[in-house]
Amino acid sequence: MAASLGGMFAGQPPGPPPPPPGLPGQASLLQAAPGAPRPSNSTLVDELESSFEACFASLVSQDYVNGTDQEEIRTGVDQCIQKFLDIARQTECFFLQKRLQLSVQKPDQVIKEDVSELRSELQRKDALVQKHLTKLRHWQQVLEDINVQHKKPADMPQGSLAYLEQASANIPAPLKQT
């Protein structure tokens, strides 16, 4: 897949970039130190990082802390955020184009990924259904217990007088002395 991403950023030669020293086989997305000026052939990722850093820099800049007009601060921050969003859209568009190329060149790979995603979604939903069934069984048992408790007192007559009558009926009659 690395070969299909060759030349993915503006100014980058086709093919995978050379690995940085000390990390064989891993491509580096950042080729310049953070905060350092970007080369003229910067990539979309470099520009995205730079605009992201600029968003934060505009928020913590000493110029803004030292009493700059609020409208000026708002305008500067809005411009930084808009630049970041524009570059993020360009980056997203690039990856969507690569995804489209991959789907044309290797449709079986896309189908495998879709099947894998669907399987994981089914497993997640099955687990959710089991969780709900467990809760349902619990509440059905609670309702059944409540119904059983309400049926037992219904067998007995209601009221204190009825209770006394029932209790006295079970007492044997006193024996007559002759």
Curated annotation (Swiss-Prot):
The keyword Nucleus is assigned to this record: yes
One annotated Gene Ontology cellular component of this protein: cortical actin cytoskeleton
Annotated InterPro entries: Mediator_Med28
GO biological process assignments: negative regulation of smooth muscle cell differentiation; somatic stem cell population maintenance
Disulfide bond positions: none
Coiled coil residues, start to end: 109-145
Recorded GO MF terms: actin binding
Localization of this protein: Nucleus; Cytoplasm; Membrane
Main location: nucleus
Keywords, comma-separated and alphabetical: Actin-binding, Activator, Coiled coil, Cytoplasm, Membrane, Nucleus, Transcription, Transcription regulation
Region named Disordered: 1-43
Annotated Pro residues bias: 13-23
Source taxon at top rank: Eukaryota
Subunit structure: Forms a ternary complex with NF2/merlin and GRB2. Binds to actin. Component of the Mediator complex, which is probably composed of MED1, MED4, MED6, MED7, MED8, MED9, MED10, MED11, MED12, MED13, MED13L, MED14, MED15, MED16, MED17, MED18, MED19, MED20, MED21, MED22, MED23, MED24, MED25, MED26, MED27, MED29, MED30, MED31, CCNC, CDK8 and CDC2L6/CDK11. The MED12, MED13, CCNC and CDK8 subunits form a distinct module termed the CDK8 module. Mediator containing the CDK8 module is less active than Mediator lacking this module in supporting transcriptional activation.
Record family assignment: Belongs to the Mediator complex subunit 28 family.
Annotated function: May be part of a complex containing NF2/merlin that participates in cellular signaling to the actin cytoskeleton downstream of tyrosine kinase signaling pathways. Component of the Mediator complex, a coactivator involved in the regulated transcription of nearly all RNA polymerase II-dependent genes. Mediator functions as a bridge to convey information from gene-specific regulatory proteins to the basal RNA polymerase II transcription machinery.
Name of the protein described by the UniProt record: Mediator of RNA polymerase II transcription subunit 28
Gene field: Med28
